[in-house]
Amino acid sequence: MATHPGFDAERLGHLTAAVERDITAGLYFGGVIAVRRGGEPAYLKTFGRSGPTHDLPVAESSVFSLFSVTKAFTNILVFQAIEKGYISLTTPLCKVIPEFRGGLRERISFFHLLTHSAGLPSLFEARPGMCIDHMDEVIAAILEVALPVEPAGERVGYAPLFNHALMGEAVRRLDPKGRSYRDILREDLFEPLGMSDTSMGVRRDLKSRHLIPEFRGNYPIKHLGHSNLGPNGAFEEEFAEMPWVGCVSTANDMMRFAEMLRRGGELDGRRVLGRALVDAARTIWTGDKPNEFYAAGIRAAGGVAPPANLGLGFSIRGPQMGVSMFGALASPGTFGAHGAGTTLIWTDPERGISFVGLMTGLMTTIDNLWRWQRLCDIVHAAAL
């Protein structure tokens, strides 16, 4: 790739050396990293292989399970529903899902769900051992068991499942065409952005390029699917519908998504979101509150838990010096999303940089945090 005038080529090359050292040390198996500045390619490199069990070489066209980066797509669908006047940020969820009534549930708004301050438990599954690939079954279980542990707005605690599953169901119920969540996602987001290699579930034509995720014992639960494809088979299901973790994509498609965010909701002349909502999404709404989901692990590793710095569904670097996957050197307004132990996207509007990292070999939550901070700092340090 030709040298980008916005980067010091030698310093950006440190990124290649660092990832290769990590792979040699066995920290993870491989991946692909892409960097753009001002919309122009600056770095694109593949590394290693998918893993010891499904040992495919990583290619630029490889399809990765995105895990919780999927939540970023659900955020956009909620924003589009706001733009169309179906809901507002302060609309209580129970206005859209009447079954979600009673007690503290009725205080929970879309704002609380997006900022992970709804007071719902930070659980990975609604019922132990249930299949998670059918959205209707998961929603039925959530409506039965999801009881707030504290009033909405009191604390910040990342919700792996409940918040975005419920918002995905709300989007489905609000749709005047009666479409499935999967179809709304494809027709209202992926197709307008030209994300042709992105889908909810592993679309049949993508299966041969899909790198089946290796969890390496670093995740607290199984992810069962109805086809009985293994302990984490939900991530191989063609028709999975999981608004919190279920999408697959490529580095190229995810860069298109990141660039849309950097450009304020528009890409290649197609606007999928108004600038006001993008601005709201990248505004910190959680004050100085830490994210309780990560705080204990950071402290145990010898760090200081920083403020959560959450916008509307997106994480933000923030002005404080502290641990950040986006890099300690990132501009304060850098924002993006990450997925379990593997995937990361961010955009730095101040410097005009967009970053996509899709890796194989799932790391623990804390190791993943340190890994991305270290690698992303190389990118920031190389910027001119």
Residue ranges and their predicted role:
Residues T334, G341-E350:
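Short, surface-exposed beta-strand/loop micro-motifs that present aromatic residues
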Residues A42-Y43, I345-W346, G352-G361:
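Short, well-ordered beta-strand elements
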Residues G13-E20, I33, G39, S62-T91, ...:
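Active-site SXXK
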Residues T3-L66, S88, W372:
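Short, conserved catalytic-motif segment at the N-terminal edge
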Residues L89-G103:
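Short, glycine/proline-biased beta-turn/loop segments that scaffold the active-site neighborhood
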Residues G361-L384:
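Generic C-terminus detector
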Residues G51, G103-L329:
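Short, surface-exposed loop or secondary-structure junction motifs
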Residues F29-G31, A42, S180, G341-L344:
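Short loop/turn microsegments at loop-to-beta-strand junctions
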